[in-house]
Amino acid sequence: VLFRSREKALEKVLPYQQDDFKGLFEALEGNPVTIRFLDPPLHEFVPTDEADIKKLADAQGKTVEQIKTIIASLHEFNPMMGHRGCRLAVTYPEIAKMQTTAVIRAAIEVKKAHPDWTIKPEIMIPLVGDVKELKYVKKFVVETADAEIKAAGSDLQYEVGTMIEIPRAA
């Protein structure tokens, strides 16, 4: 049930992400664009105001206490090193897949509109702490990107990488 509700939420977010990425590609007119995938921990996206929590509970058909329990479960002791960035994509690959879809669709759209521009998205997977994390996330990012490119009949090129931000990753 939770997976389906996440999928529905991501379907709603996809066009907004795609429009944002399209705007970046257009603003940079063919210059390199690095898109850093979702980095903040999930608790930064949940309501804190009682009225907003009540609205969310009503929309989800849950009690305020159930929503508060979910919110509390997302709180982290050390959010700077916790469940965010690459680790978030490991737990919820559908988020990174949605972002990949949005990036690639936006790039294909801008490339069609401006064939003289060099559109080559650079996708950054953030906060990698171990090569296994990067390999795991990169695999489904590449699969998603390649499927979108094939479906569109495009020859779009792209890169997937990371920035070493955590000492143990070096």
Which residue stretches match the model-derived regions?
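Conserved alpha/beta-domain cores
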Residues: 1-170
